[in-house]
Design a protein with these regions (language model features):
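Ribokinase/PfkB-type carbohydrate-kinase core domain
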Residues: 1-8, 60-74, 88-224, 294-295
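Conserved phosphate-binding/catalytic region of the ribokinase-like
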Residues: 1-6, 191-295
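Substrate-binding N-lobe of the ribokinase-like
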Residues: 6-7, 18-83, 87-91, 98-102, ...
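A structural signal for the hydrophobic beta-strands that form the central parallel beta-sheet
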Residues: 9, 45, 123-124, 239
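Short polar catalytic/cofactor-binding loops
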Residues: 11-16
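Short, well-ordered alpha-helices that flank and scaffold nucleotide-derived cofactor binding pockets
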Residues: 34, 38, 60, 143, ...
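Hydrophobic pocket-lining residues within nucleotide cofactor-binding pockets
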Residues: 49, 127, 232
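Short secondary-structure capping/turn micro-motifs that flank functional sites
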Residues: 52-53, 78-79, 158, 183, ...
Length: 295
């Protein structure tokens, strides 16, 4: 797959609210779009924010990074997405709040923002389908776009239902998930389970992320596994999976071989683990990857 079209990103933009009140901008779709912008792919992010100061922060951050904000809708009632982070015995727990602005995507406005654009693929996660309004909007966008879909499975209790997630996978060409998610959906988290999952849902490729054990990609040519690079000083792993997804998309856009895509995605995800948070505003962070001819 080699194309000059733009990636279309649909999903949640939200703030992680830490126990000390600090807000960190994120959401998997925004994180992926953020990296794709740095890669020069000019993604269009379709999301929805609220009538609040947090929304102003979203617009400000995206505009400063040079991102197209024409797909960002502003709701008059529901707040900008928020996840409340608490610490229990030193371990973080996440309360993904209900009825946020991103749960109320306006399909008509989304399609209007796509007018005149050429889109190479559609990326979305599974959280955006937790409510009927945004789930319906996503379905209409898919129908309008008729482009291949990359679904990033993120099973966050209690915000997912087995049949709905399976339906989103079946409408995709590529799917990414972790070992626990594969076990929940397929009953097995091993290599045969990945291959069976790909065949069952007629996917071109399945990406299985395995934390410090690396990742694997299963496609029609078989399964390729790789461990992460050694000697990485991990600060936190927030956003590592989103970094992987972004490089996988970059590889699709430039028709990289599967082995190269896997190696580069792991390298970039490891680099993101050396910073605090899922994204970085220093373009020098991306320079070494550009110098290696990634884009």
């Amino acid at each position: 797959m080699t194309t000059s079209g733009r990636p279309l990103i649909v999903g949640e933009v939200l703030f992680d609210v830490m126990p000390d009140g600090i807000r960190v901008l994120g959401g998997a779709p925004l994180n992926v779009g953020w990296h794709l912008q740095a890669f020069g792919l000019r993604p269009l992010v379709i999301t929805r924010v609220g009538p609040d100061d947090a929304a102003d922060e979203v617009f400000g951050a995206m505009e400063e990074w040079g991102m197209d904000t024409s797909g960002v809708q502003r709701d008059e009632i529901y707040p900008t997405g928020r996840v409340q982070v608490e610490l229990q015995d030193g371990e973080p727990t996440f309360d993904i709040l209900a009825d946020q602005a991103y749960d109320h995507l306006d399909a008509r406005r989304a399609i209007h923002s796509m007018a005149g654009g050429t889109f190479s693929l559609l990326y979305h996660g599974s959280l955006i389908s937790r409510g009927d309004v945004s789930s319906s909007a996503l379905a209409r966008i898919k129908h309008q776009l008729d482009s291949p879909v990359f679904v990033d499975v993120n099973l966050r209790d209690p915000w997912w239902h087995h049949d709905e997630v399976v339906e989103s996978v079946q409408s995709a060409r590529w799917a990414k998930l972790n070992q626990r998610e594969l076990e929940l959906l397929a009953g097995s988290g091993d290599v045969p389970g990945v291959e069976g999952f790909r065949r069952e849902h007629d996917l071109e490729a399945v990406i299985l992320t395995r934390g410090d054990r690396g990742a694997l990609i299963a496609d029609s040519g078989g399964t390729i596994e790789k461990v992460p690079p050694e000697g990485v000083e991990v600060i936190d792993t927030v956003g590592a999976g989103d970094a992987f997804s972004a490089v996988f998309i970059l590889g699709l856009m430039h028709a990289w071989p599967t082995q190269q895509t896997l190696e580069r995605a792991l390298d970039f995800a490891a680099a993101v683990c050396t910073i605090t948070g899922a994204t970085v505003t220093d373009r020098a962070f991306y320079a070494k990857f550009a110098e290696q001819g990634w884009w």
